[in-house]
Amino acid sequence: MTTPSPTPPLAAAEVAAAAGLQQRDLLAVLDRVGLEPAVAFLVHDLTARCDTPDNPDAARIGLAVEHSGHRTERVLAVRKGEPVRVDEETAGPPPVRLTFDLADLVRGVYGPPPGPGAGLFRVERDDAWFVKNADDAEPFRIFESYMRAVDVLVRAATSRPGDLGRLAARHASDKWGLWHWFTPLYEHHFARLRHQPVRVLELGIGGYQNPDEGGGSLKMWRSYFPQGRIFGVDYFPKHGLDEDRIHTLQGSQDDAGFLRRVAEEHGPFDIVIDDGSHVAGHQQTAFRTLFPAVRNGGFYVIEDLWTAYCPGYGGAATARAEGRTSIGLLKSLLDDLHYEEWTAPEPAAPGFAAPSLVGVHVYRNLAVLEKGRNSEGTIPFFAPREIDYV
């Protein structure tokens, strides 16, 4: 027996069809239908399209929706092997809340997939709750369960296929869900390489001193690139994670000699990802040493740009990141990208990366650098260098 939608059929159909309208027309439809009826219909359809959850610990996630100064919320119960449903039994606020604008949620559920960098919701997380409810033996288990639960809801709420996000959740990689939201961006840049025999090097494996712990991202990349070879570097030995297409290496990302040996033995690489110590000086050393080891057409990625604002990582407690940090490096790379356009009478020498840097893509806490031949030549000399009519 089919459970009827809690919204009148005509209104429900109108909301679904409105996803393809211009913004002002969509808002007019939502004003006419009303927040509560629209959300009732959306939640009905959203929970019905959710994949079967596989999070080991039961999760309660708030879904808040706002429209025209009004707000409503449902708490969704996400339990392993069960359909996602509205939780009307458990008291207390959920430890994770996703807040959508009503129009964005309508487009997410019924429209085409959004762009990779589209921020469609706000995330609120009660970190104290996770600390209080953590298992001493497995302190991150419940957090990882929530990462998987969030992945199920976000994919249903944004029409994203989310293959890499699903792999991140399966392997407990922090690149998607609660920690970061990187996987749509990675898919955007890496999709053309997916079925090639790529060589991927990631700095930072995770799991701290335990030789058998961590490696979630390495396993995610192994699954995403079926012909790829995945190399991981960590300060601690991680040989317990080695398998057919995953090879771990022990060393410091601040040791240029070690990194050169890695590049000589295992490079050149299609992709290098710096998810290591996040210390400013270490990031600079890794970039200087490993960017040359990326082939033309490949990518160099720096994660966790937030540490540029943290003194404990070599950053500064300021609103403007300094030159020695990852953000400072990216600012200088924008100048280097345009080195052929410099007009100073005696310009300084461009950075070493300038002739082979063809793209700088910066997102929240993530930078993707494209390697290639940056020698297009300057704008023609007869193009005006000044404007005399303003």
UniProtKB/Swiss-Prot annotation:
What is catalysed by this protein?
8-demethyl-8-(2-O-methyl-alpha-L-rhamnosyl)-tetracenomycin C + S-adenosyl-L-methionine = 8-demethyl-8-(2,3-di-O-methyl-alpha-L-rhamnosyl)-tetracenomycin C + S-adenosyl-L-homocysteine + H(+)
Q: Which cofactor does it need?
A: Mg(2+)
Q: Which residues bind Mg(2+)?
A: 275, 303-304
Q: In which pathway does it act?
A: Antibiotic biosynthesis
One GO term of the biological process aspect: methylation
Instruction: Extract the InterPro entries matched here.
Output: MycE_N, SAM-dependent_MTases_sf
Q: Its function?
A: O-methyltransferase involved in the biosynthesis of the permethylated L-rhamnose moiety of elloramycin, an antitumor polyketide. Mediates the methylation of the hydroxy groups at the 3'-position after the sugar moiety has been attached to the aglycon.
Tell me which family the UniProt entry assigns to this protein. Answer: Belongs to the methyltransferase OleY/MycE family.
Official protein name in the record: 8-demethyl-8-(2-methoxy-alpha-L-rhamnosyl)-tetracenomycin-C 3'-O-methyltransferase
User: What is the species of this protein?
Assistant: Streptomyces olivaceus
Question: Which lineage ranks, top first, belong to the organism behind this chain?
Answer: Bacteria, Bacillati, Actinomycetota, Actinomycetes, Kitasatosporales
